[in-house]
């Protein structure tokens, strides 16, 4: 019935409402909703001969889901009595329409997310990078300390399961303990705490489970994801104003698991000024887009070194942070200069924001203020979110 000539059925053509109802059975497996409610599909016309014309907008014209969606539309409509032919007029969404789709997809992800022990009013920030060596953990502990110093209760989750470093960088050596909480049958792990200024840090890390920090954790993907689930479900976090998650580098199992379990997370991307680091860091932003997470902004770490004579030297290049922020349509939250005291603070367990008034400490405090005072805008969907076509096909087959 999709050839050039409409077929004759003898039945009356369907109504717009009937066709729309059938279109609602067609799902976009990546966005997790039907193509009507996503604003992708609408009935253009229904002729007296039963020819049904559908207007279909994709996030981008070259979206690899086009073939599958076409087959799904045709199979749903062609079996309806009175339909003699189905035509599809393909188009592309505007920027505003893509933003609306992203908003709905994010809402769907939140509705479908499992319950965790993280309070619903807690702002969650995942500190991420495309690769290691950019100072992501240093940024995490200094931002956490800066937020706590002004009176906030801040959770710090060390999700870098293999490369845990948060306990040492915050000067916490106690192991995690589990105990029963009033009204809760199952014992829960209790975060280790450190008072900072007017506030409090609550810290959880696999480094607090092993015998000593030199112990290697030889865990594979499923075990990594399970560990993160336990940190979210089996830890008694209590009230938190912020939860900062020190992410492992890259875009692997832990990142995908956290995006699924905590879809209200805002991503903060750490990069150095070099172009090569910026090109790797953009993958973290792409992961956020594909997982419907918002990007709170970019932090450029190790931006420049200033000598005792006041001369500034861009040892790792310059401009990478702003370039990355511009490319992903986000904000540059700040630039942290190179100071030996930052590394020394990590070695001694005293974040520089607690011991110094120098440029690096001031940069971290300013970034924390930006985070506290800024509402993250809805991120525009930069393009099609479709992943590997085989994975998409598996999702479709499971639905059917």
Summary of predicted features, one role per range:
Residues 30-57, 336:
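Short edge beta-strands and adjacent turn/loop segments
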Residues 37-40, 52, 59, 66-129, ...:
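Extreme N-terminal, non-catalytic leader segments
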Residues 147-213, 218, 225, 232:
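Phosphate-binding loop that captures ATP/GTP phosphates
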Residues 123-162, 281, 285:
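Walker A/P-loop phosphate-binding motif and the immediately C-terminal alpha-helix
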Residues 348-358:
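C-terminal boundary of histidine-terminating zinc-finger modules
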Residues 230, 234-237, 241-348:
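Conserved catalytic-core segment of NTP-binding enzymes
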Residues 2-40:
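N-proximal, solvent-exposed amphipathic alpha-helical segments enriched in charged/polar residues
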Residues 64, 209-223, 269, 273-276:
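Flexible beta-alpha connector loops of hexameric P-loop NTPases
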